[in-house]
Structures are given as structure tokens and as C-alpha cells.
């Protein structure tokens, strides 16, 4: 059974927030024990990237997180594909940001367009750099990657990854959009090999139509939370002990506290 103290719930930076720091400050003020930094600057200049946060600000983030027992993670920009050499310089910036802020995990998307074996080879330098600083690497499912991709990914990683340095970030909203499990993210989980280590969770909802990132309990689970209960039960069976990140900045922001309260009640 999950020990509540081992499961942390937090929020994430957001393009729609008033400032880069606003969601983090909200997490601190409201007692969240996890937080994720997601550099999301787009072509129009909206959002933020690693260059926008100074060395001094990074140290303040690290010290604040330590003082408030907040576990930090960093979500690499979605377009950073380890298979593409032109993205490696930016990926290094993301790693430095994680190191400077004391983050315990870096999250990247799984890109399977050149095959799973090619992706495994591509992340070798990344996982070695992170392991040097005790930082875990989480590989996230996208709407285009399914359970079988992750079963193959971790069967290959088990051949070279001992002790394990890499785990899965289970994105519930993306699992709900996966072609093989559309509108049935529990089926996605059930199709995962029991040996796939889920170490991080991204939590948001949709109706199977697009990646709308609805706050938890405002989409299908608002009418029937059975799916969320099933998710938590499955994570208990897997001895999940990582962070659950609420991937939205809702209005009002107090929805985040309400979501956390309901989740903790379900976790028990």
C-alpha cells in the first residue's frame, strides 16, 4: 500500500500564469510538496526558458524548495528530441537548470519515430550526466506512444540499466488520447508490463478529443471519479512513490488545492 508521505502532489509552471514564479510561489504558500519547472517559451516569445532565470534566482528556488520540503522536477521543452543533434545544446541547458535548482528528476518525451532501440541509444549520454548528480530520468508517454512502446523501451533498458536510472512518467491525459486506449487510460496502465517502473505522474483530463489539459475532476472525473480511483489502486499495486504533477494553471488557482484534497482522500 502507498504510504501517503511517499506520494507528493504538486503543480507546474504555465504559459497562462502572470509570471514564471507565480505557480511556484503558489505551491510554497499552499503547502504543496512537489513542483515542476517546464520551460515553454514559444516562437512568439511567450512563456519562459532557462535563460530567463538567473543563477541567483536558481539558488533561491533551490533553497526555498529545501526549506519547504518541496521536491522539484524539470520537464524538458517538448520539442527537445534526444535523437536530434541540434537539440542537444538546449538539452544541456535544461540539465544545468535541474542541477542548479536541486531538482531530483528530469522528464523527456518518448520519441519512437526511429525505433525504440535508437531512442535507448540516444539517451545514454543524458542518463549518465543526470546520474552523476543523482537526478532520475523520466520518459513520458505522448498521445503517439503506447504501452507496447514502453514495454519494449524498458525491456531494452533493463539490459544496460543496473541499478535502474530511468523510469516512466505516466501522463494520464496522453494515455487517454493514445489510439490503442482512447478514452480508457486504465487500459493503458493495464497493458504496461509490471516491470515498467512508473516514477512520475502527470495528471490532467480530456474527453478523448484533444490534449486539453483539463484540471482533474473538471472533466469526465467530475461526474464519475471511478477512473481516478482505479488509477490510484493500480499505482498502489505498483508501489508508486513519486510525484503527481497537476499539469495546469486553473482559474481560480484554488482548484489546485481542491484537487489535492480530493486526491489525498482517494489515496487514503
Tell where the protein language model's regions lie, with residue ranges.
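Catalytic-core regions built around general acid/base machinery
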Residues: 52-69, 122-129, 156, 188-191, ...
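Active-site acidic/histidine proton-transfer and metal-coordination neighborhood
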Residues: 64-68, 79-170
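N-terminal pre-domain/capping segments
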Residues: 1-92, 99, 167, 268
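Histidine-acidic metal/acid-base catalytic patches
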Residues: 1-8, 17, 21-28, 92-96, ...
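Short, basic/glycine-rich phosphate-binding loops at helix/coil junctions
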Residues: 71-74, 102-105, 208
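Active-site beta-loop-alpha junctions enriched in small/polar residues
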Residues: 12-16, 38-42, 77-79, 111-113, ...
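Hydrophobic residues within beta-strands of alpha/beta enzymes
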Residues: 35-36, 106, 137, 201, ...
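Residue-level detector of anion-binding/catalytic polar loops
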Residues: 33, 71, 104, 136, ...
Amino acid at each position: 500500500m502507498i504510504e501517503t508521505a511517499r506520494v507528493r502532489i504538486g503543480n507546474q509552471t504555465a504559459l497562462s500564469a502572470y509570471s514564471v514564479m507565480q505557480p511556484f510561489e503558489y505551491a510554497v504558500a499552499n503547502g504543496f510538496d512537489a513542483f515542476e519547472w517546464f520551460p515553454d517559451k514559444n516562437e512568439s516569445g511567450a512563456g519562459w526558458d532557462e535563460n530567463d532565470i538567473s543563477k541567483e534566482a536558481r539558488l533561491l528556488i533551490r533553497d526555498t524548495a529545501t526549506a519547504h520540503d518541496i521536491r522539484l522536477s524539470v520537464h524538458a521543452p517538448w520539442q527537445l528530441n534526444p535523437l536530434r543533434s541540434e537539440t542537444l545544446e538546449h538539452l544541456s541547458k535544461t540539465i544545468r537548470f535541474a542541477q542548479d535548482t536541486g531538482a531530483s528528476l528530469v522528464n523527456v518525451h518518448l520519441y519512437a519515430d526511429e525505433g525504440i532501440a535508437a531512442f535507448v541509444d540516444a539517451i545514454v549520454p543524458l542518463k549518465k550526466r543526470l546520474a552523476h548528480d543523482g537526478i532520475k530520468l523520466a520518459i513520458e508517454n505522448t498521445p503517439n506512444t503506447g504501452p507496447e512502446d514502453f514495454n519494449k523501451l524498458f525491456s531494452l533498458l533493463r539490459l544496460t540499466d543496473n541499478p535502474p536510472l530511468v523510469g516512466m512518467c505516466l501522463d494520464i491525459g496522453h494515455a487517454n488520447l493514445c489510439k490503442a486506449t482512447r478514452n480508457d487510460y486504465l487500459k493503458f496502465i493495464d497493458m504496461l508490463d509490471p516491470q515498467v517502473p512508473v516514477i512520475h505522474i502527470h495528471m490532467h483530463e480530456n474527453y478523448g478529443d484533444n490534449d486539453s489539459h483539463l484540471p482533474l475532476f473538471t472533466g469526465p472525473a467530475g461526474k464519475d471519479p471511478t477512473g481516478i480511483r482505479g488509477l490510484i489502486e493500480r499505482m498502489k499495486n505498483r508501489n508508486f512513490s513519486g510525484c503527481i504533477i497537476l499539469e495546469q494553471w486553473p482559474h481560480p488557482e484554488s482548484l489546485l488545492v481542491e484537487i489535492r484534497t480530493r486526491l489525498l482522500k482517494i489515496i487514503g
